[in-house]
Structures are given as structure tokens and as C-alpha cells.
């Protein structure tokens, strides 16, 4: 096994190494959230992980209700979803405030979003983070006769302004005024 480096930060252990070798040694996870290389650039480090090997390594770490969230972009995300259709459930679309791909701006649109594909076998714990919306006026009542608003009994009420999240989420990026490399 090739663990290159291990650090504990804020009570969490971060391991730098080959995930295909390290994951099977770690036990069960409550969730897996990862941003693997997509294989979409010419960078030496940007080689897509072999999906069959990845799912094989994950098999020892996840249970049927363990959510696996994998960040990606096209065409990587399509191939990723197709690699495990049985467990694929849905995508989140991360609307990014800062687009990327400026070198290709004259050839194709800037990339202003990232795909987060969600996989699991059984429904895991889901606690939706409600968002604030507009309070809507609704009619509540039992008797309603209308030929364009003839006799109506009941009352108007306002629904909550809390809304369930949709599949497009926006988070600000951690942009720094200066970067250190």
C-alpha cells in the first residue's frame, strides 16, 4: 500500500495516496464525497480513474445506504453515471460564480457549473436545507362555486416562505486575493 502522507486536521484524517489501494483498508464510510480527475485536459495528473476499479475499491467501504457523491464535468460525468446505473440516483448542478475555460472562450461557452452525481442503493439520510422563497397566497376552503369566481367560501392564507432545494445549487467559491503555490 502506498500512503504518501497522513495528516489530522480538525479531528479529520486526510490521507494522500492511491485511493484504489488505500480505500479497502479504511473500513466503512458514512458518506463518500470526492472530486476525482476527469481526464479532460492534457495535464499528466488528469487521468480518469478506471470506473470498474473505483467501484470495486468502494464496495468494501460503503453500505447500501451510503451516499457516494462524485464531482465531474462532461463527458466524464456521463461515463461515470453509465458505469453504475443501478446505484445512480440524481445529479446536483453546482452553479459556480466564477466560470472556467477562458482559453477556449472563443470556441465554446465558459463552464459555469459542475455536476455532482449521487449514487446509493437504499435511501440514505436526507435532510434538505430549506431556502427562502416568496410567500404565496393560497385559497383554503371546502365550498367553491365558480363561473368565474361565483360564491366562494373559505379563506385566503399564506404558505410558508420556506422552499425545498432544487437540483441547481449555488455556493460562493473560496476565491482568495492572492494564491500561494
Residue positions per predicted region:
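Core catalytic lobe of class I
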Residues: 3-181
